[in-house]
């Protein structure tokens, strides 16, 4: 069977490899670590802004996936992650692919994510081809559908864990079709692929996409049940239910810890804003015209729109899909076409906020708490591409379209195009004035789309040149995929000095970052860091992190500034030390930890001729900003520098930026060239001479951009410049221990040990995070600074010891008098039962598959 399809298999594989040619050749560097870790040195971008939109490919896939792979390769089941937060579940977080064997083992290699994406793309294309061929579409149409799905935009926007679920949607539908055929023929089995697809989609690590794929599969199942004769209907239902139940039981070792984690975790905005969230207006054109703004995956003003669309279809597939929706009389699969069209319309209406649709879909359990506008579009893309394959197959089999059908296609297409483009049309003039370099790629893209549409329309009208049209559509998908890789770096490298320093000196203490060596990346190098970017997050830890460490309280420091969080660290040094934090990293140019920063109130005056956005003030040459600040009631000190958060429009700003400060009749000035500034970061200007201030002194400042291209002053939520004055410290403060090309590392004076006994007379030896030895003159207690979470067990001299919470987040056990050996282990609840159930389900699956094979023989 496979031999007869070797050409299609080869073509689909080559299409995927060609679509990744730039990244495979190393021409541009799309390594997520250099893009997202904050450790890049001298990075130079190429033509566009980014290879991806969602940094989860770095934080989750590359960083935590590598940790999981390392655990497996060392014979450790990756249940627990001691290197993020103060420890938290690893496999239960699911998005890191911990149990997605064997694919997760590829993440042992630094560039394993590339191999993963290639495999996921190839399998997605091949399985879509197989599904369409199973529906009796011709091979050219099946090839077109498989190629389109293997090149879908979601692979670009979210290249990490999300991509692993893609291949299981066509596999699940193949399983349903085989079950349907087996029920009609009264054959046993037929459900094996259903179990495999459901288990794979859950183990792949993204339950939200698996959920919407499951809803589409459930709709397909209802259609097949309605089409099945009554005598075979119960057989079909039994097969599908059997496959679904076995698939769920196969995932029990991961699913049960995940469900427990949902109950004990902080889900952030899920279930609050997700129920009413809709795609922004700027996103409306991107599904049909992904190059509408001249670049893919942009980190500019429209980045949020890219983050909120999930993927795209393109114009030619939409035209073919519309052609398939109204087939000729007697055309096959009319009901299937209607189902897919309804699925597309309903989910598109929900994503873009059509009144009533949101409330209706939220009645379905689970929909209101999922990020539907990002994770439902994959199933919509699949539906569009399947319909496009139907349309192409109609052309191949039935010849050219009638005038009436062609008129319908043209009218419906231009309605869809208008609904996509018109809402965002007003954004274009300002966009291309700000980014004139993007006009050329936008025009080239428009030319390519026009050519492909013309070829498709010609084929619809004449029924000829189908191979050329097919080749043009696939070529357009390949070129679009290659375009995203132009967002890689032409040069630059990762600063590993800080990593090496922490690996040598951190031991069992922890690290905290205000920017560089970003969240979860320390875990890749087995360095414990309290920053965490994952969902869910243990609620007891999240409450402490969000309310006691950050200023103002907020999740993951989103929306805060480096100044605010540096001030929070200074104000809460004792709290950080109590968590075992010894080292803190800040970006170059950021406010130093051993200085106190004074923020400014609203400015006295601002330029009236500069452009003003919601978050920035654009200063033209010769303009100034003035304002006042009052020194706090504290001992006299000296201001020696000012830090201003600037936007340089990707390094285009230049010329001198000056600041003057006056207090008590004395003034100090400073000036620096904007070519030294980092875009969207603090720009420090030293004052000459330093300005002494007294408590309560009124300070007047003036920021002047004398000459050169415009520069943007970032504004706070109060619409004030993000200005901070660095004041010499008068108290014991952190010591700077490393100045590397990418970050500064400070050491806190008194970090708490990882574990300590309640009696000073106890002799405690900490061998590692799980094994310790103690010798106490009398009974005592042991405080272990690891997250208190169900599943932890302790044994003292081989005897179980009860673990009690301390401060809601740490662990405490009793210690006996005399020598004791202490061991901590973690295993989620019901693990033995869930593993036994999964093994039994696997055995049943294998035995039934063998029995069915013998029956066929």
For the regions a protein language model found, what residue spans apply to each?
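Extracytoplasmic
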Residues: 276, 434-441, 445, 466, ...
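Beta-sheet-rich sandwich/jelly-roll-like modules and their strand-loop junctions
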Residues: 598-700, 704-731
């Amino acid at each position: 069977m496979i031999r007869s399809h070797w050409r299609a298999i080869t073509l689909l594989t080559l299409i995927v490899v060609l679509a990744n040619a730039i990244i495979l050749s190393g021409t541009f560097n799309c390594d997520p670590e250099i893009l997202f870790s904050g450790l890049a040195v001298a990075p130079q971008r190429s033509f566009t802004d980014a290879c991806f939109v969602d940094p989860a490919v770095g934080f989750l896939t590359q960083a935590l996936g590598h940790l999981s792979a390392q655990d497996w390769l060392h014979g450790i089941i990756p249940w627990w992650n001691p290197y993020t937060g103060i420890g938290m579940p690893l496999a239960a977080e699911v998005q890191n692919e911990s149990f997605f064997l064997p694919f997760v083992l590829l993440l042992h290699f630094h560039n394993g994510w590339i191999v993963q994406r290639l495999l996921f793309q190839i399998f997605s294309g091949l399985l879509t081809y197989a599904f369409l061929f199973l529906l009796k579409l011709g091979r050219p149409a099946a090839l077109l559908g498989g190629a389109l799905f293997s090149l879908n935009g979601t692979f670009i926007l979210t290249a990490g864990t999300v991509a692993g679920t893609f291949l299981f949607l066509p596999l699940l539908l193949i399983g349903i079709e085989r079950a349907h055929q087996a029920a009609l023929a009264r054959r046993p089995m037929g459900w094996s692929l259903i179990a495999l697809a459901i288990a794979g989609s859950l183990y792949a690590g993204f339950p939200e996409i698996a959920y919407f794929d499951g809803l589409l599969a459930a709709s397909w199942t209802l259609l097949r049940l309605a089409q099945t004769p009554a005598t075979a209907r119960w057989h079909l239902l039994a097969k599908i239910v059997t496959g679904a139940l076995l698939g769920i039981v196969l995932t029990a070792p991961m699913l049960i810890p995940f469900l427990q984690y949902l109950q004990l975790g902080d889900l952030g905005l899920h279930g609050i804003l997700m129920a009413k969230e809709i795609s922004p207006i700027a996103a409306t054109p991107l599904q049909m015209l992904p190059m509408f703004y001249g670049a893919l995956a942009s980190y500019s003003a429209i980045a949020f729109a890219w983050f909120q669309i999930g993927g795209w279809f393109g114009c030619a597939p939409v035209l073919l899909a519309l052609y398939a929706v109204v087939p000729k009389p007697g055309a096959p699969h009319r009901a299937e076409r209607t189902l897919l069209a309804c699925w597309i319309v309903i989910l598109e209406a929900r994503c873009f906020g059509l009144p009533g649709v949101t409330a209706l879909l939220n009645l379905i359990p689970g929909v209101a708490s999922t990020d539907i506008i990002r994770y439902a579009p994959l199933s919509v893309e699949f539906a569009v591409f399947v319909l496009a394959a139907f349309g192409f197959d109609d052309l191949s089999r039935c010849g050219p379209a009638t005038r009436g059908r062609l008129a319908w296609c043209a009218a419906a297409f231009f309605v869809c195009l208008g609904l996509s483009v018109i809402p965002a049309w007003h954004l274009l003039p300002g966009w291309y004035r700000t980014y004139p370099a993007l006009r050329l790629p936008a025009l080239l893209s428009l030319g390519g789309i026009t050519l492909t549409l013309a070829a498709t329309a010609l084929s619809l009208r004449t029924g000829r040149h189908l191979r050329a049209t097919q080749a043009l559509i696939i070529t357009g998908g390949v070129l679009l995929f290659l375009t995203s890789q132009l967002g890689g770096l032409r040069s630059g490298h990762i600063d590993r000095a800080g990593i090496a320093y922490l690996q040598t000196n951190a031991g069992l203490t922890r690290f905290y970052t205000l920017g560089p060596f970003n969240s979860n990346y320390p875990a890749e190098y087995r360095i414990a860091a309290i920053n965490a970017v994952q969902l869910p997050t243990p609620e007891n830890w999240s409450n402490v992190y969000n309310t006691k460490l950050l200023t103002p309280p907020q999740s993951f420091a989103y929306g805060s500034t480096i100044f605010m969080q540096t001030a929070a660290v200074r104000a809460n040094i004792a709290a950080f030390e109590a968590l075992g934090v010894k080292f803190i990293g800040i970006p170059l140019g950021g406010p130093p930890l051993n200085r106190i920063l004074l923020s400014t109130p609203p400015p006295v005056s601002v330029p009236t001729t500069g452009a003003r956005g919601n978050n920035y003030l654009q200063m033209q040459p010769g303009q100034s900003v003035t304002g006042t600040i009052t020194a706090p009631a504290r001992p006299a000190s000296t201001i020696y520098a000012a830090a201003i958060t600037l936007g340089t429009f990707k390094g285009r700003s230049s010329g001198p930026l000056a600041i003057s400060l006056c207090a008590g009749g004395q003034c100090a000035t400073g000036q620096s060239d904007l070519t030294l500034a980092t875009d969207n970061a603090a720009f420090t200007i030293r004052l000459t001479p330093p300005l002494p201030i007294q408590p309560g002194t009124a300070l007047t400042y003036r920021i002047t951009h004398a000459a050169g291209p415009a520069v943007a002053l970032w504004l706070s939520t109060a619409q004030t410049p993000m200005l901070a004055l660095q004041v010499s410290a008068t108290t014991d403060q952190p010591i700077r221990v490393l100045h590397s090309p990418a970050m500064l590392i400070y050491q806190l004076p008194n970090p708490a040990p990882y574990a300590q006994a309640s009696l000073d007379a106890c002799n405690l030896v900490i061998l590692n995070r799980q094994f310790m030895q103690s010798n106490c003159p009398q009974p005592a207690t042991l405080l272990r600074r690891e997250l208190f979470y169900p599943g932890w067990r302790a044994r003292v001299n081989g005897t179980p010891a009860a673990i009690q919470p301390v401060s809601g987040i740490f662990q405490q056990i009793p210690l006996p008098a005399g020598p004791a050996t202490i061991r901590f282990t973690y295993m989620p609840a019901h693990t033995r039962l869930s593993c036994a159930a999964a093994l039994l389900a696997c055995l049943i699956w294998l035995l039934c598959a063998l029995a069915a094979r013998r029956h066929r023989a």
